[in-house]
Each structure stands twice: as C-alpha cells, then as structure tokens.
Amino acid sequence: MYKRQSDIIIISAPIYNYGPPATLKAWSDLAARIGETFRFKPNGRREGLLKNKHAYLVITSGGTKLNSSEDFLTPWLKFILNFFGIEKVDIISADQMALDYEKSIKEAEAQIENLFKD
C-alpha cells in the first residue's frame, strides 16, 4: 500500500480572488478522511495523522500581498495542513506579480536560496 509514504509535500497555488483555486479546495475536501488524514480522540478533539511531514507552499498572486488581510489562501492552506497533522510548513511567495514581475521573481528566488542553502 502507498499510504502516506511522502515525507515532503509541495503545493503550488495562485491566489484566485483572494482565496484558493477550486481544484485545491476540492483536493482538501477529498483528502480530509477520518482514519486517513485525521481522527477524533475519545474526548472529541481531532488529531491530524500526517505526522513528521514537511510541506512547501509556492504561492503566487497578481496583486494580492501574501499574508495581507486580503490573502485568504495562505492561512486557510496552513490550517488545512495542520488539520492533517503537518506542522512544518515553509512558504515561497511570488506575490504581486502584476505590479512588479521582476521583483517578485527575484524575491522568490532569494527565498528558495535561503530555504535550501547548506
């Protein structure tokens, strides 16, 4: 069986109208399975089952600033991953690309360099 074999998860998503694309929302709905990605404890609280995983999020946007009050994708996606038990989440952002494409790309490249430097 191939259940939960990946230790690293990479999700790339644009901010569409301030939130997640419909396909990413559909993925989260399909992935949320009792006994697979989370469970309920006897006290009724939930527990994520995907422990010791590392998620990398590559978030892009045309005009929305990442982590601004208009960004509903990033906090939602971090919540969903935590709901599944994935607590280690690193974000690479290329936001506001419509405003200054070159700057956005350079900043994203710098974030990648910083994440993966030896």
Indicate where each model-derived feature is located.
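Glycine-rich phosphate/pyrophosphate-binding loop and the adjoining helix
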Residues: 66-118
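Helix-loop-strand module that forms the ligand-binding subsite of alpha/beta enzymes
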Residues: 3-75
